[in-house]
Amino acid sequence: MNNERIYQVLKGPVFSEKAQVLGETAGVQVFKVDINATKLEIKKAVEKLFGVDVLKVNTTITKGKSKRFGKTLGRRSDVKKAYVTLKAGQDVEMADLGDTAESAAE
């Protein structure tokens, strides 16, 4: 998997109360990912980008809501989230994401 595809697959971390509790108790990190990304692509992207061992990947797709903008009816985009379980004792620091992006550009 090339570096460009890694950054297409992983869109960013999810910051929520549930994600924080899972990260602290079960060693699970939550990421927003590309809607077409497969579990294998997500696993390889996290392992390569953060240098950790991934045990399993669970994904969910949240359908976008219909919203009104004045007279027009719009729709929010669907979002795919990946719950990535890491090997015991390993953790992903979100500061690592910025460091890796800078080193990949060099």
UniProtKB/Swiss-Prot annotation:
SUPFAM superfamilies according to UniProt: Ribosomal proteins S24e, L23 and L15e
Ribosomal protein keyword on record: yes
Domain of life of the source: Bacteria
Pfam families for the chain: Ribosomal_L23
GO cellular component: ribonucleoprotein complex; ribosome
GO BP: any one term: translation
Molecular functions per Gene Ontology: rRNA binding; structural constituent of ribosome
Disulfide bonds: none
Keywords (A to Z) from UniProt: Ribonucleoprotein, Ribosomal protein, RNA-binding, rRNA-binding
InterPro entries per record: Nucleotide-bd_a/b_plait_sf (IPR012677), Ribosomal_uL23-like (IPR013025), Ribosomal_uL23/eL15/eS24_sf (IPR012678)
Family: Belongs to the universal ribosomal protein uL23 family.
Oligomer status and interactors: Part of the 50S ribosomal subunit. Contacts protein L29, and trigger factor when it is bound to the ribosome.
Role noted for this protein: One of the early assembly proteins it binds 23S rRNA. One of the proteins that surrounds the polypeptide exit tunnel on the outside of the ribosome. Forms the main docking site for trigger factor binding to the ribosome.
Protein name: Large ribosomal subunit protein uL23
Source organism per UniProt: Acinetobacter baylyi (strain ATCC 33305 / BD413 / ADP1)
Lineage summary: Bacteria, Pseudomonadati, Pseudomonadota, Gammaproteobacteria, Moraxellales
